[in-house]
UniProtKB/Swiss-Prot annotation:
Alphabetized UniProt keyword annotations: Decarboxylase, Lyase, Pyrimidine biosynthesis
Originating gene: pyrF
Active-site residues from the entry: 62
Record note on quaternary structure: Homodimer.
Pathway listed: Pyrimidine metabolism; UMP biosynthesis via de novo pathway; UMP from orotate: step 2/2
Binding site for substrate: 12, 34, 60-69, 117, 170-180, 193-194
GO terms for cellular component: cytosol
Protein name from the UniProt record: Orotidine 5'-phosphate decarboxylase
Lineage, uppermost ranks: Archaea, Methanobacteriati, Methanobacteriota, Stenosarchaea group, Methanomicrobia
Catalyzed reactions: orotidine 5'-phosphate + H(+) = UMP + CO2
NCBIfam families the UniProt entry points to: PRK13813.1, pyrF
A GO MF label: orotidine-5'-phosphate decarboxylase activity
GO annotation terms (biological process): 'de novo' pyrimidine nucleobase biosynthetic process; 'de novo' UMP biosynthetic process
SMART domains: OMPdecase
Amino acid sequence: MERNTCMILALDVTEREEALKIAENVREFVDAIKVGYPLILATGLDIIRELARFAPVIADFKVADIPNTNRLICEQVFKAGADAVIVQGFTGRDSLDACIEVASKYGKDVFVVSEMSHPGGAEFLQSAAEAIAKMAVEAGAFGLVAPATRPERVKEIRKIIGDRLTIISPGVGAQGGKASDVISAGADWVIVGRSIYKAESPKEAACEIAEEIQAELRGK
């Protein structure tokens, strides 16, 4: 996945036409589009290929099952046209290996959740985040998911992985995270959803956040 704008759109809407319209409007400001269960369950897997006309698609299914089931899920995701999948790390190395094995077959990427962005994400996952990060490096994942709502945690994860993996960071905007703060902490991409797709002008909102990111990068 190429790093140009350093922003990923989290497209958590449930209407096909709305999703396509937003994706087309903001395409110049995002490096990828992240889709999850709300949109996929409402419209079907075919929406992935439709959105891929505008930007690479990350399937945020937080895959968390036994190796064989993980393998089957990832097969469907990549056959549908996704460029990457997000998986949970707490299920262990064998389950992660199954996802990476399928991704390698298709020439695609795997992002591993180290810690989620909501307050509850600090209750159980935080204590395992560093071990998950180390495992992701050893397994050969492409990147980690770390919370924009807690930039200090992004900084800690970056210390562990160095430049061996990328970091995508959700929670910018509606959840309280600030794009420039998390880029400064070491994230490669920020993930923004409601602040863009619920804005009166998604294009203007995306442009504004993209400019904030670029200003931070210029200041580094």
